[in-house]
Amino acid sequence: MFLAQEIIRKKRDGHALSDEEIRFFINGIRDNTISEGQIAALAMTIFFHDMTMPERVSLTMAMRDSGTVLDWKSLHLNGPIVDKHSTGGVGDVTSLMLGPMVAACGGYIPMISGRGLGHTGGTLDKLESIPGFDIFPDDNRFREIIKDVGVAIIGQTSSLAPADKRFYATRDITATVDSIPLITASILAKKLAEGLDALVMDVKVGSGAFMPTYELSEALAEAIVGVANGAGVRTTALLTDMNQVLASSAGNAVEVREAVQFLTGEYRNPRLFDVTMALCVEMLISGKLAKDDAEARAKLQAVLDNGKAAEVFGRMVAAQKGPTDFVENYAKYLPTAMLTKAVYADTEGFVSEMDTRALGMAVVAMGGGRRQASDTIDYSVGFTDMARLGDQVDGQRPLAVIHAKDENSWQEASKAVKAAIKLADKAPESTPTVYRRISE
């Protein structure tokens, strides 16, 4: 038997906690036998003293084990259980293509996703722009969809990593969110509860990233790879660029439209293609569905070319109560904004810099995201035809096309776009989409 205050004291004095001490504390968070003050105190001591790798693994596994851990053995699946997690960005719609692409190659992807947070878009919000789409199927239905379709994208239920929910709520109001061991445990507790064989992390870098600097993004990626592998799940991470909007669009319905166009081959943004393919390659190799990069890319390109990936997406939408003909008739089903109009730069030039975070907040301000949990989302608003770094803009080439609910909203958004995009006399040097791969 342990005392919470003695565990806090031990960490306060700079000592490493044992696995048993960490499990006692996390179980107490779940059972409400540990107070909010005690959670805050431990979080602050971890913030200042960090954690060793064994402590980080113990914390993550204790949080994972605070609730249900999915077990797929009874389904006798003939492929690996794999997933991807992104630290979030703007126009980051990779999940909607990646899940079906990997499923079409023989993987099973039980993706538990989140809503928009701050300036970043949420996969669940995007999917809810599809009429009828059910993000909370019951457990049996979730398992059926995984077995039959190969991929389902759902919301987090209260039974998955419940200790994380309470721990995070306290961190949020005590300035202890940005601690790498705590971020790592929070992300991985939920992902490892999916019962995965392999995981790839997409850690964003740049003006629209969760972490403010390249070095911190790199440190987070290394921590996640170390802890997840320590917890027994084959994990790699990619550091990918978020110095500009990833897709050509940012919003909810507009990103779903782009995802369908990507899968069917109607239109593929080259940067979005690069990042999506790179993440899928990691999933296929870690999941032992391909032996190397070349084989993985060939398999992925094949399921795009032969329509299998698009077919899997359509089957997932139908299985989660969306329209059965969504892929064929997406334009009929997705909501459209009242006003769609381009915004142009005041001068000619080359796009040299983009405040991606500000563009994400502009989508939120238009109604495309939540400022507080009770807000309702306008799924139709957002940006399309976004200019990319290096593009020449003038009276013919707009900065973006704005989808707004009215003229006032359009005016505010156009000001935000102009303020967020800087122009120069010559094009900047191109930057990579993937900066670094991190493995154990």
UniProtKB/Swiss-Prot annotation:
Alphabetized HAMAP family for the sequence: Thymid_phosp
Top-rank taxon, per record: Bacteria
Keywords: Glycosyltransferase, Transferase
Gene3D superfamilies the UniProt entry points to: Nucleoside phosphorylase/phosphoribosyltransferase catalytic domain, Pyrimidine nucleoside phosphorylase-like, C-terminal domain, Transferase, Pyrimidine Nucleoside Phosphorylase, Chain C
GO biological process, one term: pyrimidine nucleobase metabolic process
Metal-binding is among the record's keywords: no
Name the UniProt record assigns to this protein: Thymidine phosphorylase
InterPro entries attached to this UniProt entry: Glycosyl_Trfase_fam3 (IPR000312), Glycosyl_Trfase_fam3_N_dom (IPR017459), Glycosyl_Trfase_fam3_N_dom_sf (IPR036320), Nuc_phospho_transferase (IPR035902), PYNP-like_C_sf (IPR036566), PYNP_C (IPR013102), Pyrmidine_PPas_bac/euk (IPR018090), Pyrmidine_PPase_CS (IPR017872)
Subunit structure, interactors included: Homodimer.
Family: Belongs to the thymidine/pyrimidine-nucleoside phosphorylase family.
SMART domains: PYNP_C (SM00941)
Pathway of action: Pyrimidine metabolism; dTMP biosynthesis via salvage pathway; dTMP from thymine: step 1/2
GO cellular component: a single term: cytosol
SUPFAM superfamilies: Nucleoside phosphorylase/phosphoribosyltransferase catalytic domain, Nucleoside phosphorylase/phosphoribosyltransferase N-terminal domain, Pyrimidine nucleoside phosphorylase C-terminal domain
Pfam families, per the entry: Glycos_trans_3N, Glycos_transf_3, PYNP_C
Enzyme Commission designation: 2.4.2.4
Residue intervals passing through the bilayer: none
GO molecular function, one term: 1,4-alpha-oligoglucan phosphorylase activity
Record's function text: The enzymes which catalyze the reversible phosphorolysis of pyrimidine nucleosides are involved in the degradation of these compounds and in their utilization as carbon and energy sources, or in the rescue of pyrimidine bases for nucleotide synthesis.
Reactions mediated catalytically: thymidine + phosphate = 2-deoxy-alpha-D-ribose 1-phosphate + thymine
